[in-house]
Curated annotation (Swiss-Prot):
Belongs to the class-I aminoacyl-tRNA synthetase family. A motif ('KMSKS' region) lies at residues 266-270. The lineage of its organism: Bacteria, Pseudomonadati, Thermodesulfobacteriota, Desulfuromonadia, Geobacterales. GO terms for molecular function: ATP binding; cysteine-tRNA ligase activity; zinc ion binding. Its EC number is 6.1.1.16. Zn(2+) binds at residues 29, 209, 234, 238. ATP binds at residue 269. PANTHER family: CYSTEINE--TRNA LIGASE, CYTOPLASMIC, CYSTEINYL-TRNA SYNTHETASE. The keyword Chaperone does not apply. This is Cysteine--tRNA ligase. Binds 1 zinc ion per subunit. GO terms for biological process: cysteinyl-tRNA aminoacylation. A motif ('HIGH' region) lies at residues 31-41. It comes from the Bacteria. The gene is cysS.
Amino acid sequence: MPLRVYNTLTGSKEEFVPINPGKVGMYVCGVTVYDHCHIGHARANVVFDMIYRHLRSKGLEVTYVRNYTDIDDKIINRANRDGVPYNEISERFIKEFDNDMARLMLQLPTFQPKATEHIPEIIALVQTLIDKGFAYQSGSDVFYRVDRFEGYLKLSKRNLEDMQAGARIDVDERKEHPMDFALWKGAKPGEPYWESPWGQGRPGWHIECSAMSTKFLGETLDIHGGGKDLIFPHHENEIAQSEAASGKPFVKYWLHNGFVNINSEKMSKSLGNFFTIKEILESYDAEVLRFFLLSAHYRSPIDFSDQNLKEAELGLERIYKALAGIYERLASGANTPAGADNAEFVEKVAGFAGRFGDAMDDDFNTALALGHLFDLVRVINRELPTASTGLLEQAKAEVAKMAAVLGICDSVPAAFLQRMKDRKTSDIEMSAEEIEALIAERAEARKAKNFKRGDEIRDLLLEKNIVLLDSAQGTTWKVK
């Protein structure tokens, strides 16, 4: 099936047809680098990394641009608070961001421009808007005339008059209209600045993205992405700037990811439920966090909680255990004739790529795609002892292709599972090896019908919050 995406601009799913056949230009708004990144940043960046991977898996040549906003009021305020130059703050948190994204296994974008490296392009774009009558100078500032652009608010489906009537906006004598926004800000004493035709100053937030996206991708982009919180005002203002300057549509497909809630409440610093990526990764493996973020459809809200992270951990372990089983079986050299393979397993393996691809082509439905993967894992676990080597190799290859699109299961299965065991036992007084030894002793006791000793071992482990799970495949354990 063809790839279909939900376009925020039209409010509907549309077939994705690149402007230039075989090539895709994608711009995603990056972070303002003044502090550590939080779980909301993690979701947006993991989502668009997944989209980038899927587009490339379909044979498309993708130019992916993700910027850094490295000059902004928040950066200046943080620098003043810490008593350091603004660029010391921005460079520090660019490195922090890059480290967070590497841990979450993001592929590098094609370009990662910084706003401060594109001041000439920004100044030229502001001048174009002034020349065309869409912007005006007021003192050392330059503002955009929102009522001059006919398509203003077409992305957010708002009404300018209603917004003006309902808004509590302080009167700003510098502006012609209360909703006009800054393209260029005159420098205040002690602030960083650049020379411009309007005096010393720095760019506004919105103009940076218009200038950088068009420099690297041209006047019309295939995809522009970001969180839903950016629809207004940021993306709305980007459209106004870019289309007024070029006279052409700015973006063909607008994609926006949903919010992250914390224990069913909106995340906010004021509620005290604000978590940085670094804080989360102190308690959970980075791959588990990535898996969790992809477990829901990217446009849906997702609820961050310890329970949901633990469920994601168990889900990822199920996949890795199935892969570990395949590796062990293949390493054993045992073989079964292909003709003896279970028909359901043959069908699940043969049809997996199509089902997974169809789910991903339906507006990047990772939740459905993972459902198909768990169907395959279930059959792998059941048929592992008797399946032919060829079918197991095929199953392993199919899972690897899926994993490459989602950016998961990149570790050696045994190493990942050991990492999980070590993490789980870090807060208890027993190592994974000691637990496994007791499980082996319990199995021998039960085999010898010494059920009393078996129960003693079970109870001993339970006292240390370790729960044993018996199944036909053997005994596993988890921390309560």
